[in-house]
Amino acid sequence: MKSIHILNQPLYQTQEFFTPFALTDVLIEDSGQQEQPYLHFWQLSQGMILGMKDTRLPQLQAALATLPASGYTPVVRNSGGLGVVADAGILNVSLILPLTNQKLSTDEAYEKMYHLIQQAFPEVTITTGEVATSYCPGEFDLSIEGQKIAGIAQRRIKNGVAIMLYLSVNGDQQGRGVLVRNFYQAGLKESFGTQGYPPVDPTSMANLADFLPKMTPEEVIKRLSAVFPKAKHLDSRDWLNQLADTSRYESRLASMAQRNQIIKEQKNDSL
């Protein structure tokens, strides 16, 4: 396998929210075709990233109406799972691997991300296991001292896989939890915590910086990058600009726009 390429770029603003999701899909395809692994870091400015299940909330319009007052903009992602918060204190990390000459089970793929995080932060004990009262709970939630700091999902396209982690690094994690709890309470009313949606308890989650003081997203990027000393570093925008054929990327952007049409419709209905 080729040496890994590490991609990063400045914080995505609201008008660019579709970009990292479209880019991830293109990177997965490219990884499979070129047998090229990638490590992709990205952040959104004040977003709530929704799963498709979130768009089926009984009171979706009421749920979405809770977000603007807190300054967060919803975006529906192109992978499974439930809602997570994204802001300047949250780092999203995608480990993208070719599957052309190797097979990775779902659990094996999750383990690769878990081991990467362990390598980067050897001074703390990080455990896996679902934190049921966190937002977007899953079997491979990452926790320190019983509090969730990160969640992992994955997406497979043809001969590539993206193992995607969101890591709460610093900032107001309690406030993030309240934001998501309010979202589901508005969307479910008296059915809060049922129908496959989590009974979010903000105290079930914490920041990495709560255990490693002064930790920042920039420091996390340095630590994770140090695991790959021979990596080539690129700006994601430069990588996109050098694509000979941008039609795949444009197609993925269009798919994201279509997926998010439901958000636009709900907003229009509320006017």
Regions found by a protein language model. Name each.
Residues T19, L23, Q59, S105-M113, ...:
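Short amphipathic alpha-helical segments
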Residues V124, N159-L271:
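Long, positively charged amphipathic alpha-helical accessory segments at protein N-termini or as interdomain linkers
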Residues L91-A132:
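Contiguous, small/hydrophobic- and glycine-enriched helical/loop subdomains that border
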Residues A62-T66, S70, L116-V124, R223-A231:
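Generic non-transmembrane alpha-helical segments
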Residues M1-N101:
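N-terminal lobe of the biotin/lipoate ligase/transferase fold
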